[in-house]
């Protein structure tokens, strides 16, 4: 009986079938061979079961596909193909669909995280979130700022500080009488307070200098202030050079508001001497105090005169950093206005008065009200903007990178010179031996040991004489 009767009309040679099966079994991982094998036998009707012959002729009625649990988009390429079966017993093989965005948890960084980004942002790495990490760590740690106020008594230093930070730092202050002021010397007082605003903590330290400029003879009255600044640098240098550097408290003075009296025709000799003595140690911001005692034209003339004298005497006050070319135009205009306002003409007040139906901080006069936070009356808002809102970090950076580094370099140079000098002295002492006394022979020594000691003594004396002769010849030669 012919074996090909089972293959009616579409018989395939037996050797071809066996060769294809053998090739398929030899490499089951080759997709190309699998496709070729299926293609060779796809047209053979006898390869399918009898009920499969009518599958293509039946009308295909779409059936609802069961919903599967969601899966990420990256797993789509691993879904196995679904092979069609008869409509009587039709089955589907498919991987779960992707997880819907509403069902999966949200990233703490929002759109900056590729987990929540769109398909176009899948190549996003994520290091752009570093500013967020630094911000979170900095807010958790808090910030330090030390502000020094210097100037004569009665110029409104304490009042201005309270107005700047909306707090009362001098509630325990005791006002001295006339006799006590005569005997008063320059002192350094510290007022520390923790301020919190919108979750940001600031450890503010105010350094006051009561008694400065109040004496009849103010010669070198700036020395206690300079010594205090150097002491803070020295303490920070020691902490930085120690073993435990994790929790170093920064008490370095970051800014000094120097108050200039509105009475006179510019800077006084004491003002010039103070600023020249401290401009290499701290950021100096000149303040024209009690600006409400001057008319607007007088304020302009006073500012211009002070700026000319500062430049004439070579005083280096705090310099505002230059704006970058890509900065916003509004920021550039604001920065230019701050630079032109030096020295800041300010008014301080702790009293709240009512002006035009509003309660403001100001001073009440018979002719009207002077508002502290009115830009048309004084430069208080500009000073607060510069000191707190825009340039506080730059003041700290200049202190760390310029003033403290200068002090640190001087300390290292002094230590190096001392070490080199000590080494040279020890080396000269060892070579000359003049400072080392010749030891005496201990009693009870045997004759041989005594003889060796005396020979060494004679040798040392000859070497010393030769060294003295060489040194004498060198001096005569040079």
From Swiss-Prot:
Query: Which segments show compositional bias classed as Low complexity?
Result: 95-108
Q: How is it modified after translation?
A: Ubiquitinated by AREL1. Phosphorylated by DYRK1A.
Query: Could you tell me where this protein is found in the cell?
Result: Cytoplasm; Cell projection, Cilium, Flagellum; Cytoplasmic vesicle, Secretory vesicle; Cell projection, Axon
- Which residues are recorded as modified (Phosphothreonine)? 434
Task: Offer an example of a GO molecular function term for this protein.
Answer: GTP binding
> Which residue stretches, if any, does this entry annotate as coiled coil?
446-478
The segment annotated G1 motif runs over 151-158
Q: Which Pfam families match?
A: Septin
Q: Which Gene3D superfamilies match?
A: P-loop containing nucleotide triphosphate hydrolases
Question: Which one GO biological process term can you cite for this protein?
Answer: hematopoietic stem cell homeostasis
- What role does it play? Filament-forming cytoskeletal GTPase. Pro-apoptotic protein involved in LGR5-positive intestinal stem cell and Paneth cell expansion in the intestines, via its interaction with XIAP. May also play a role in the regulation of cell fate in the intestine. Positive regulator of apoptosis involved in hematopoietic stem cell homeostasis; via its interaction with XIAP. Negative regulator of repair and hair follicle regeneration in response to injury, due to inhibition of hair follicle stem cell proliferation, potentially via its interaction with XIAP.
The record's PANTHER family line, in alphabetical order, gives: SEPTIN
Protein name stated in the entry: Septin-4
